[in-house]
UniProtKB/Swiss-Prot annotation:
Chief location category: cytoplasm
Subunit annotation: Monomer.
Keyword Cell membrane: no
Protein name: Peptidyl-tRNA hydrolase
Biological-process GO terms, alphabetical: protein quality control for misfolded or incompletely synthesized proteins; rescue of stalled ribosome
PANTHER family: PEPTIDYL-TRNA HYDROLASE (PTHR17224:SF1)
GO MF annotations in UniProt: peptidyl-tRNA hydrolase activity; tRNA binding
Gene behind the chain: pth
Binding site for tRNA: 15, 66, 68, 114
């Protein structure tokens, strides 16, 4: 089961609504779902909440170290409570996935994400779970830093929030350790409903002047 849920982002009001803070948004949504409140914990260099689920302690963490030092916070809490990497899930922004989608995976490279890079280094492994929240790509590599540190357009923000709410449907499976079910829930989105069409003979004649 997942015992430590981490959301990546940067602290401070100037970063709160930026794409790079999508992981923070996810943890905020999970905290609301579990009815817990994140509070500062200096020992773990972040905002922390503890929930009790089926007799097990579950931890929520938002590192307050700034993105590039996220591993310091994650490793401090994981080591103190003896949580192995395979029981950690890190929610983060993902350039290679469009807004409105999220993907669940275990292990793999950090793909240039500095928060993941530091977690790799501090845990000494990449063998932890990631929830990759799509923020889209600016199309030009040179614009990536500017892109992640800017606010998404309102329609993109709505899509990102929709994907966060959709992926939260998987949290009971994550807590139960049913990662196949969790993956299916995260990756499956409802296709748009086809528009109902009337039989030709049943259609009313257009009124004069309706054009």
């Amino acid at each position: 089961m997942i015992k430590l849920f981490v959301g990546l982002g940067n602290p401070g009001p100037e970063y709160e609504a930026t794409r790079h803070n999508a992981g923070f948004w996810w943890i905020d949504a999970l905290a609301r779902e579990l009815k817990v409140t994140l509070v500062p914990e200096r020992s773990y260099h972040g905002l922390v909440a503890r929930a009790s689920v089926a007799g097990h302690s579950v931890w929520l963490l938002q590192p307050q170290t700034f993105m590039n030092l996220s591993g310091k916070s994650v490793a401090a809490l994981a080591r103190f409570f003896k949580i192995p990497p395979e029981e950690i899930l890190v929610a983060h922004d993902e350039l290679d996935i469009p807004p409105g989608q999220a993907k669940l995976k275990r292990g793999g490279s950090h793909a240039g994400h500095n928060g993941l890079r530091d977690i790799h280094a501090q845990l000494g492994t990449s063998d932890y779970w990631r929830l990759r929240i799509g923020i889209g790509h600016p199309g030009v590599k040179a614009e990536v830093v500017n892109w992640v540190l800017k606010k998404p357009a309102p329609d993109q923000r709505t899509l990102i929030e929709d994907s966060i709410l959709h992926s939260l449907k998987a949290y009971p499976a994550l807590l139960a350790g049913d990662m196949d079910k969790a993956t299916l829930l995260v990756h499956t989105t409802k296709p748009p409903r086809p528009k109902a069409t009337r039989p030709a003979q049943a259609q009313a004649a257009p009124q004069a002047g309706a054009d």
